[in-house]
Design a protein with these regions (language model features):
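Metal-dependent phosphohydrolase cores
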Residues: 1-142
Length: 142
């Protein structure tokens, strides 16, 4: 079992802590997506898949190639890595494509990843908006 810090260090080595994503860093987004699936009772392999879900890049983010697949498998396991690979290759928006192209547990896992990914971005956007509104309100009071 690979510890959390080793996984985070690998993501940092790929620049995830420097790349911006939805007003935070990509690393913060990946951790947030993983945390949502964890809170929802997702399995450990699904949590790992969420933590790494953009490691190969997506339609919106060209991050890395799939040349690190063996390294990623060694960190999160084959089942989680397969989900990461499929997720990264699935064009956005994903939900309908996942429902059409996959069945069974893979479909359930991909839909859970997609939902957590979208929810994390929504939560981050709401926090940023509330922070901005709070600052505007404070300025108005002063």
């Amino acid at each position: 079992m690979i510890d959390e810090q080793t996984k985070i260090e690998f993501l940092k080595s790929m620049g995830c802590d420097k790349e911006l994503h939805s007003g935070t860093t990509l690393l913060e987004h990946l951790i947030g997506t993983r945390d949502i699936v964890k809170e929802r009772g997702g399995s450990e392999y699904l949590q790992d898949a969420c933590l790494f879900h953009s490691v190969y890049g997506t339609q919106r983010f060209s991050h890395q190639s799939t040349s690190d697949r063996e390294k990623v498998k060694s960190l999160i396991g084959e089942k989680a890595e397969e989900l990461v690979y499929i997720f990264s290759m699935c064009p956005y928006p994903r939900t309908d494509k996942i429902k059409t192209m996959y069945r069974g547990q893979i479909q359930e896992d991909l839909l859970a990843m997609d939902g957590a990914n979208e929810d994390e971005q929504l939560i981050t956007s709401e926090v940023r908006l509330n922070t901005k509104l709070g600052k505007l309100f404070q300025q108005h009071l002063n």
